[in-house]
């Protein structure tokens, strides 16, 4: 049940927003092994002049940037999966948005199963139900 938060320092063109949300969802499914039907994504656009790296506006730098955070249940992905996701996310964002500053970030944030959920139930409760244990 990942939640993907994507912030772009780029013009907010509807086709780019759709492409980036779709591609990051695909990577979450393909690399992290998450279920597409419960993967949600939000894309926010920030004017490049409002995004700085090293104290310099991206307007002046002539490049774009992004911040991506995908929230997953703790312990459900290996270090290799997380590293592959971070690399693929940067490559995908650059393919869609054009040249990006190296300080463009992708984070796989692990949240304890008892600390989050969807449809009113924690992931721990869902796991307990699957194995027949009260959570």
Each PLM stretch: what is its role?
Residues 1-135:
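A domain-level signal for the structural core that forms small-molecule/cofactor-binding pockets
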């Amino acid at each position: 049940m990942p939640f993907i938060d994507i912030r772009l320092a780029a013009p907010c063109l509807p086709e780019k927003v759709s492409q980036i949300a779709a591609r990051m969802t695909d990577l979450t499914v393909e690399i992290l092994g998450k279920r597409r039907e419960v993967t949600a994504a939000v894309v926010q656009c920030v004017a490049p002049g409002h995004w700085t790296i090293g104290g310099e506006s991206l307007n002046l730098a002539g490049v774009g940037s992004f911040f991506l955070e995908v929230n997953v249940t703790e312990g459900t992905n290996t270090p290799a999966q997380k590293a592959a996701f971070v690399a693929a996310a940067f490559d995908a964002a650059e393919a869609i948005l054009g040249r990006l500053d190296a300080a463009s970030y992708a984070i796989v944030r692990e949240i304890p199963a008892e600390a989050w959920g969807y449809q009113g139930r924690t992931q721990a409760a869902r796991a307990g139900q699957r194995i027949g244990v009260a959570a």
